[in-house]
Amino acid sequence: RMVFAATPVAPPGARVIYSDLNAILLGEIVRRVTGEPLDVVATREIFRPLGLRRTLFRPGREWLPYIAPTGLWRGHPVGGVVNDQNAARLGGVAGHAGLFASGTDIARFAQFMLREGALAGGRLVRVETLRAFTTRATPPRRGAGQEARALGWQALPTGERVSSAGTLFGPRSFGHTGWTGTSLWIDPDRDLFVVLLTNRAFAPRARRSFTLLHEVRGQVADAAARASD
């Protein structure tokens, strides 16, 4: 109800305001249209066709040895539980958070994006559909805080003081970061992607962990770009 009642603070396409509300709403739309839980639909329609064997919502205990802890509860490490409180209230399955995946699976997904909807088994999504998601949807602007966005993806420029995509990724690049310390950036012009999975959120006593991770992300992206050139 709160999401339905929310009103835009700027016209579409005029300003970038990071928000989870649209993704939460999209997940609910999928649930209502299909009559099935979002995780069931995502597994059948996305994860299995892409061959993503270690991508899932609400991982069971058997997955815990493969999941880095991202928090502490009464002094004990906690892993395999979504950190986002809104997703937690939705049972751990939501359109904006709650998904766990391995580096190998994310790399396979990145290859799928680079090939514009195709993998070794054939084409799964139309090229024009993929391009609709990865093409910048906001006006190009420069300067501090001027972030660009595609549909569900961050685009360039990121508007950050230190870009998580570094300084060398091409203008058509797209990616996303995660609060717990994860990130994926894809450069179609270089046929390059960078996956960086950390558990930054597990360091409650570390100072400036978010700022430092931004710098690390940028440095890793630049190193990968130089290596590919």
Task: Please report, for each region that a protein language model flagged, where it lies by residue.
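Short, surface-exposed loop or secondary-structure junction motifs
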Residues: 1-172
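Short acidic, glycine/proline-rich loop/turn micro-motifs
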Residues: 14, 206-207
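Juxtamembrane/interface motifs at transmembrane-helix termini
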Residues: 60-63, 206, 213-216
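Short, surface-exposed beta-strand/loop micro-motifs that present aromatic residues
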Residues: 98, 173-174, 180-193
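Short, polar N-cap/turn motifs at the start of nucleic acid-interacting alpha helices
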Residues: 195, 205
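A short acidic/small-residue loop/turn micro-motif
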Residues: 200-203
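Surface-exposed amphipathic alpha-helical segments
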Residues: 209-229
